[in-house]
Every structure is written in C-alpha cells, then in structure tokens.
Swiss-Prot record:
This is Putative carbamate hydrolase RutD. It comes from Serratia proteamaculans (strain 568). Residues 14-115 form the AB hydrolase-1 domain. It is an enzyme of class 3 (hydrolase). InterPro entries: AB_hydrolase, AB_hydrolase_1, AB_hydrolase_fold, Pyrimidine_utilisation_RutD.
Length: 267
C-alpha cells in the first residue's frame, strides 16, 4: 500500500495512523497534518485498491482483510503500537484492528462511525450504489458531496467542488473495487464484539451528519468498555474538512490528554 510518513521525526515521537473513509485516499486528512505533525509521527496511507495503492480488491474482501493490511504496514515500519484515527470506514478498520491486533493500538478515534449499519446509512449507500451502476462514475462522484457536506458549505465552495469533480472522476478507484469495499463495510457488525475492544476509544460525531446519524456514535461510545463521546454541532459527515479548527482541537485534546473520568467532550 502507498503511504507517507509526516510530522515529527524524533526517535521517541509516538506514531499516529490516519485512515480515510470509503474514498480511501490519505489526502483526505490534509487539513489535519500540520496540527497533528507537531506532536506525532503521522502515517497516512491509501487503502488497498484506491488512489495510489493500486490493485484489484478480491471477491469476499472483508473488514478483517483491511485491518490485516494496516497491521502488516505497521510491522513493516517496526511500529509496535500506535494511535489510530479513522473516518467512517477508516474508523471501522480501527475497531477491527483493536479487536484482532489489540497490542498495536494504544488509543483509537472513530469519526462518524457505528456499531452496526444504521437504516439511514444503508439508504444512502443504496442510492449511491444505484447511481454508480445505473448512471456511471461521473454521476456518482457529482452526488458524493451531498452526503458529505452541509448545504451552506456546498453553496460557498461551488468552484472547489467543480475542480474536485474532475479530479475524482479521473482518479476513481473503479466500480468493482468500490462495490466490494462497500459490501465489506455494509456487512460489518461489531455489536457482538464491542465488549472485547478495551482500547481507549473516542467516538467523534457531527450532529448534522446526513450519512451517519449522530446517535450511532452515542451507541458506539456507550457500548465500548473504555468508550468516550465527543460531538460537533456543525460540519456534516466530513466535518474534519468543513470545520477543521474545531475538529482538530477536539481530536488533539483527546489524543494528548491523560486518561481520566471525562466521558463527554464539547468543541
């Protein structure tokens, strides 16, 4: 898999892994790199079968496969333990990594994640599947911002979105790869295993997320033995992009704090 190592390069700097959502590209985390890089050795990677991690995703691909890929990457870098931050699908990878490779994850942040797929998220995924299969890649990519960003942000960034449309269409991961990765995501149900995930975990959500209702993060935090919850009032599904300042403040505050009894954080 393609990866980059950024931020602190001192021998004792803790390693932080950033894992994107369904798009898979590590560039999703660009708004966080400078802030996180002041404190961590930051590893960003492109999920297998996306962006610069070329390859064909096999039939039957699973969340366990995605977590094993990260574990292999960490071992190739001689990283025994890391902080892990994942957005949506990336957060699910983090949960799976903490379940099957618990020694590798010191602290975990799941951004807009869930214990099991919510009916609203399933509805959105079905619409996106239908767009891709019936209308093609450009229609799928053109609709994607509607699920990610608040309406006012969309209105204010129209030119940027037009530029991104061309780039994302040209670098699309491929229909088969996306559908197999999406199937793996939709089939994942952590409810039987949450009690076994003892890694300190922050469930971070935005109350105006159209794709993943905020109550999913509430359920996740409440079901984990060492789960905590943080909410943002605004930002949509990709609030790390739309409200970077608040997002980074919450994220860094939790990653750097010592463990205590605080269970709910606010921006």
């Amino acid at each position: 898999m393609y990866f980059e190592i950024l931020g602190k390069d001192t021998p004792l700097a803790p390693t932080l892994v950033l894992s994107a959502g369904l798009g898979g590209a590590g560039s999703f985390w660009q708004p966080q790199i400078n802030a996180l890089g002041e404190h961590f050795r930051v590893v960003v990677y492109d999920h297998f079968g996306t962006a610069r991690s070329k390859g064909s995703v096999p039939d039957g691909y699973s969340m366990a496969d995605m977590a094993d890929e990260v574990a292999q990457l960490l071992r190739s870098l001689n990283v025994d333990c890391c902080y892990f931050v994942g957005h949506a699908l990336g957060g699910m990878i983090g949960l799976q990594l903490a379940l099957t490779h618990p020694q590798l994850v010191e602290k975990l942040v799941v951004v807009n994640g869930w214990p099991t797929l919510d009916s609203q998220t399933r509805r959105c995924f079905k619409v996106r599947q239908d767009l891709l299969l019936n209308s093609g890649v450009e229609a799928y990519v053109r609709a994607q911002p509607l699920f990610l960003f608040p309406a006012d942000w969309l209105s204010q960034h129209s030119a940027l979105l037009d530029e991104e449309l061309q780039h994302q269409t040209a670098h699309f991961q491929g229909t088969e790869n996306l559908l197999r990765r999406l199937t793996a995501l939709m089939n994942t149900d952590f409810r039987p295993h949450l009690a076994d995930i003892t890694t300190p975990t922050l469930a971070l959500c935005s109350r105006d997320d159209l794709l993943v209702p905020y109550h999913c993060s509430h359920q996740l935090a409440a079901s984990l033995p060492n789960g905590e919850l943080a909410e943002m009032a605004y930002g949509g599904h990709a609030m790390s992009v739309t409200d970077t300042e608040h997002f980074n403040r919450i994220l860094l505050g939790w990653l750097l704090k010592t463990q205590n009894a605080q269970t709910r954080l606010q921006p």
